[in-house]
Amino acid sequence: MRLYLSLLFLLTITISGVNGQKTTVLGKITENITNNPIPYVNVIFKDTFTGTMSDLNGNYNLSSVNPTSVIEVSAVGYKKQSFTIKLNQVNNINVLMVEDVVSLGEISIRLGENPAIPLFRKIVAHKKENNPSSFPSWQSRLYSKSEIDIKNVNKSLSKKKLMKQFEFVFRYIDSLEVQGKTFLPVFFTETVSNYFHNATSNTNREEIIANKASGMTTDMITQFTGKMYEGINPYDNYIMISDIGLISPINSLGLQFYNYYLRDSTMLNGRKIYEISFKPKNMQDPTFKGKFWFEDESFALTKLEMQLSTKANVNFLNNLTYSVDYQSKEGRWVPRNESLIADLDIRKDKDSEKIGIMGRKTNVYQDFKFGEEATVTKVPKNAIIVSKDAIKKDDNYWNAARPFELQKRESGIYAMVDSIKTVPLYKTIAEYIYMFYYGYRDLGKIELGPYYSVFSSNKIEGNRFRIGGRTTMKFDQQWRLNSYGAYGNKDKEFKYGGGLEYYFSKKPRLMVALQGSHDYDLLGISSNAFTRDNILTSVLSKNPYTKLNMINRVQATIDKDWIRGFSNQLYVTSSHIESGPLIPFLDQQGNLIPAIRTGEIRLNTRYAPKETIMVDGFQRSTFGIFNPVLNLAVTSGIKGFLGSDYEYLKLDMNFSDKIALNPIGYITYYLQAGKIWGNIPWPLMKIHEGNESYAFDAYAFNLMNYQEFVSDTYVSLFLEHHFQGFFLNKVPLFRRLKWREVVGVRSLVGNYDQTQHAGFVFPQGMTGLRSTPYTEFSAGIENILKIIRVDAVWRYNYNNDQKIKLGVMFSLQLTL
């Protein structure tokens, strides 16, 4: 992954575009008898995906830098016509359309009728029985080939001083231009796997038995190259790409989003096949244009070609092209070949000469088996299994496993990328990209960081300086050590922390750890907030941190994965929490209580059934866009255990999920509930998450102060609806901005038993909740300049004193 990021960074800052000659065809299309203009006539370059349609006045204009010498003109109810054109110049061709009769079995459709609509309804009616995901059980041998390229690369750049070290790379520029662009490959991988599907249990399993990648051979890369990370099934109503639900052309409600046109019919192996083209009704909707073919008996797709609407409200994607051919096996139509091309730009516009990224993937399915033959027992759960020798296959294996030979250029990519890793400039760039992404500077056996905590400031410490580090896989494959030290120029006290981790297994995880620290901390801060010593916390904070306590903490941890999506974490913790300099611990007589000590055992159970975990060394990432997550924690404080002063029991549950509501976006929610038993002081109660910064926090009450409310019984709900531009896409002024609407509500019900406070009094500004729920509402715009979100937040109640009732908050997010 570091190699891939480094190549993109290096080439992006140094490469400029190239120019190509353009061929243009324009004119007017009219009916041959009445001479009336005909709208929505298809005009395409023959044997390409490049085409257009005539407008309401019958005019058309088609241009390309990679055309063919023939255009085809077609429309339902008219005879198809072809015209030869001259390349690299403007061609003016007016077309007279001649009426035709299209025959569909016993039905004759004449001019003015649309035969595509009843046929489309038949396809929808038979979707379930034709959807491969609905077949009871099947398996297939799958070959996948993936490539990532830098597009619009000029070979003359190899002569520039900065690129001299990479001169050999430019020999691999693709000499075959695709859609008028040149490409320099920077990543190439092949995968052979056995793919299993069980519709009854709605589970998939992929066993990756061979993988060959261009210089990158980690498990994380290997798992991403298989089948389970595509998620494209045309039979689904919506094709999920990140948070965006792209509307399938055979969506059950497709007639609301697409216009369909019957174009042709042919015979294939004794079967009659019809061709239907489609285009979006609203180009700003996340829709496609293209065509599909289907069999007239089963109404199953036999082929599909589609391209994302160029005006769709999807970030960075200039083009997304997908095609699939189906084959008939045992009376079922299943995929044979799939092709996916993604054209990405930082700026999505019509300038085809800008530097960008092109991703290509090809899948070939072979050896289908159904029912008992598909060894259904091998699909007990969703999983990706990587064979231990997957990256060790030799050339003889790959020559036999490939369904077709690699191009000479493709074969050379492996050697090219391996050579890049030896270039000094590459190594330097890779180090800085890793530092930016992970927050640590890699020095070999150790990493220094995180860099964003090197400097910060607060009311107690003044200017705080910190240095820390951790070991890497080069130090040890199973042991990981970490430590840090910090010093404030105001309190003039040294703070420190450190720990060690031991991994019996990284996947599934079995890890034990011991961590200790002597440092200030803010009780009750959101887990989603910037860390207290993050420099951004100092910059974005409305008020300097004052509510800090010195905490001496030692914690032992056992972390165990049982099955996919199910894990436990056991914590044994000793804490010594000192009275804060500005938030002292006081009893009811006003006497200072210097500190409180706790010893507790906590067991957390985590269940995320749709979550996928990627492991790369010590790095662990979780994936699952629409992934429900349940956490259940039981904490027992035992008086006398590790010197604890208190006896208590805590039960806390939280559940989060994201629900697709296509085509009107999606909802996210976070539900938390808990109960605490025991006579304990307020620092051990539930301190509800406030936010005193200008940064919007999705898991905090954004107009609640830190440590403003505490409870021993509580229920809270955070809910947001992201409309993904559903309304603004229909407003002419805003649709070009591609802004997206978001609304939210945050509410909290809590109770505090005033007889169970261990003699502590609340500090100034803290209280318990009354019977009325605390509530905040928010409304905002996201996707401003693709990365900015702005929310107006309204505090509905508990507005006594000088509390802020209305605020405007900002956040950054990077999504499609």
Regions from the PLM with identified roles:
Residues 41-45, 71, 109, 140, ...:
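Hydrophobic beta-strand segments
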Residues 23-25, 32-47, 66:
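Short, ordered, surface-exposed loop/turn motifs in non-cytosolic proteins
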Residues 244-246, 378-816:
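Exposed, low-structure sequence patches enriched in small/polar residues
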Residues 1-28, 43, 70, 101-107, ...:
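Bacterial Sec-dependent N-terminal signal peptides
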Residues 49-59:
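Short, acidic Ser/Thr/Gly-rich low-complexity loop/linker segments typical of extracellular
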Residues 101, 106, 110-273, 279-287, ...:
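Structured extracytoplasmic
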Residues 25-31, 58, 95:
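A short, amphipathic beta-strand motif
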Residues 45-47, 70-83:
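A short, solvent-exposed loop/turn motif at the edges and junctions
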